[in-house]
Amino acid sequence: MRLFKEKLAWAAPLAVIAIIALFSVNLFAQGNPQVRNLPVALIVNDEGANVDAVSSAVQQMSKGIDGEEPMLAFTIERESDIEDLFHDKKYYAALVIPEGYNDAVQHALENNSPAALQVYINQGYNITGANAAKAALNGLIGQLSNKYSEEFKAQLGDQKIDTDQAAVLVNPIVSQEK
């Protein structure tokens, strides 16, 4: 009986319940965080149809799905400014279309070497955001690579190819991370 009369004996269990409730509400609110509108720089150092294909893929990615905000928000910048922009924490990452990319894609099977798109990652900004941007950009490059792989397969038809050409045929565009 004395236990029920003491106010301090009731305070400890109530405080524990209140703390547990507070943390569960906090975890429930963070249940499924969505990455939206991460700023990413697009740096175009080349011209041509294959560069336009990358630009149109970037525009598609910038639209979002079903009216939702896109994961990445692209802005065109110059490569010479990227270090300062990363230092100022303006971008999580940058997708660079290097000079000679258009020719590298057109002659990938002849040269037995895949074309490369460069991905710069700003790990100093926010590692979670940088990793999300990196994954999204690598996914974009993978989609472009699959598209060109199908086109190259259609062009080759029943021709015999060597192992180097087969490697390029499977992965005609690669990502170079910096």
Predicted features along the sequence, with ranges:
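Extracytoplasmic/periplasmic domains immediately adjacent to an N-terminal transmembrane anchor
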Residues: 2-178
